[in-house]
Amino acid sequence: MSREIPRPPELQRDVDFWIRVYSQITTLQGFLHDERNLAIVYSTVDLPPTERPGSPVRRQLIDNERTRWADALREAAVATEQGAAPSGADALRALELWGADATPDTLRAAAEAVRFQLGQADRFRAGIVRSGQWESYIARTFDSLGLPPELAALPVQKPGS
């Protein structure tokens, strides 16, 4: 029995996205990205540290950025349909990100699929620190159950922490 967790190649772009969420950006940042193609990250949004999570100020900032990218994707769709280059920098960036997949229909659909993902790097690090006291117990338990030791990293972030 292989102890390695399978990683199908078709999931690699999604794995890479989540690695970035849990290692590069904190809960004071987030990615605006395509909800289906996680390789498409439009921008990183910096959130005001003085505002609570879910505050109206934060929500408005995220909504404004989401609208900005949805508008850029619609502009890129129209330009692509007309065989022209878009004039806006964001629309040009959207075309660059989508590459050969940048058809008018794809870009219009993407305009409706701009999603925000809050960073988790600070929570993840804190979870690793918290789990340190249980490390040897978890390792022994996983070994006795024949589970891959890499699974021990999964519970380091409890929801809502």
Question: What residues fall within each predicted segment?
Answer:
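Secretory-pathway/luminal and periplasmic proteins that interact with or process carbohydrate-rich
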Residues: 159-161
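Cell-wall glycan-active module
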Residues: 1-155
